[in-house]
Amino acid sequence: MKNGRGNRVAVVGTGFVGASYAFALMNQGIADEIVLIDANENKAEGDAMDLNHGKVFAPKPADIWHGDYDDCRDADLVVICAGANQKPGETRLDLVDKNIAIFRSIVESVMASGFQGLFLVATNPVDILTYATWKFSSLPQERVIGSGTILDTARFRFLLGDYFAVAPTNVHAYIIGEHGDTELPVWSQADIGGVPIRKLVESKGEEAQKELERIFVNVRDAAYQIIEKKGATYYGIAMGLARVTRAILHHENAILTVSAYLDGPYGERDVYIGVPAVINRNGIREVIEIELDEEEKKWFHRSAATLKGVLARYFAQ
């Protein structure tokens, strides 16, 4: 165990996502200390060695070591990447039975260390497992965050930017709802340079509208395509996790589409779901309730109902 100085991030699960996330943290100089925890201690130790050998190339070298749950005591943030991976043909919700028991063990072990920081959950189905983390930890809702639709939103902005030939950073558009098959695009609030995207395609005819629909389908189904081609997704979500981590540790008050607990916003209660939220060192400062059109409201409620239906099998609602 290192002597805690500066910001400490504990990464639980050093598979594809966890290791890629630690690599992103190192390359961006986000954390001062990174501890890697995995049931396979040799894997965690090997990753720590590998990352340490690249310290000289990092913008802000971090202390990196493989550890155990006791190291979570002084962590500012515990990021859970452990669990069963999604296989070809599986939906994210198919993973619940496999991962819920794993999460109970992980969260209880973290809390037993005396941990008083924030949880960030990456494992799928992320909305369900973020709710489980909140329940198992008994922490305030704002201190438990899921990666939500941060990657879906990034995919959306990338594909829209590609279609309109502008930088994705200049595309303002959100994917909200379940990180999964019932997620939805908020077309009513999407714009590029202040011009609504719906207005941009008005003059281009029906084919342009169909292309927007195809873009959303490609966003929604991207994970299935990547899993089919290479077995897993990890680079994109690792960078998304790093972005959330920076917002937390650097107290940025950044608006990101994370899995946040709703207790009234969007007309929903007692569910973690992907929505824009203000993120800082205290966790979720507030949920941003963007104005949805009637069709989007119906779609969002269907998405929330899907998640609640799964939660009801494991937690009293």
Curated annotation (Swiss-Prot):
Cysteines engaged in disulfide bonds, as pairs: none
Functional pathway: Fermentation; pyruvate fermentation to lactate; (S)-lactate from pyruvate: step 1/1
Alphabetized Gene3D superfamilies for the sequence: Lactate dehydrogenase/glycoside hydrolase, family 4, C-terminal, NAD(P)-binding Rossmann-like Domain
Residues annotated as binding substrate: 86, 92, 124-127, 152-155, 233
InterPro entries: L-lactate/malate_DH, L-lactate_DH, L-lactate_DH_AS, Lactate/malate_DH_C, Lactate/malate_DH_N, Lactate_DH/Glyco_Ohase_4_C, NAD(P)-bd_dom_sf
Binding site for NAD(+): 17, 38, 43, 69, 83-84, 105, 122-124, 147
Keywords from the named record: Allosteric enzyme, Cytoplasm, NAD, Oxidoreductase, Phosphoprotein
Compartment annotation: Cytoplasm
Protein's UniProt keywords contain Phosphoprotein: yes
EC numbers: 1.1.1.27
GO cellular component: cytoplasm
Catalysed reaction equations from the record: (S)-lactate + NAD(+) = pyruvate + NADH + H(+)
Regulation of this protein's activity per its record: Allosterically activated by fructose 1,6-bisphosphate (FBP).
Keyword Oxidoreductase listed: yes
An annotated Gene Ontology molecular function: L-lactate dehydrogenase activity
Broad enzyme group: oxidoreductase
Active site (catalytic residues): 179
UniProt-listed SUPFAM superfamilies: LDH C-terminal domain-like, NAD(P)-binding Rossmann-fold domains
Swiss-Prot/TrEMBL GO biological process terms: glycolytic process; lactate metabolic process
Phosphotyrosine sites (modified residues): 224
Family the UniProt entry places it in: Belongs to the LDH/MDH superfamily. LDH family.
NCBIfam families reported in the protein's UniProt record: L-LDH-NAD, PRK00066.1, PRK06223.1
Quaternary structure (record): Homotetramer.
Xref: HAMAP family: Lactate_dehydrog
Protein name: L-lactate dehydrogenase
The species this protein was found in: Bacillus caldotenax
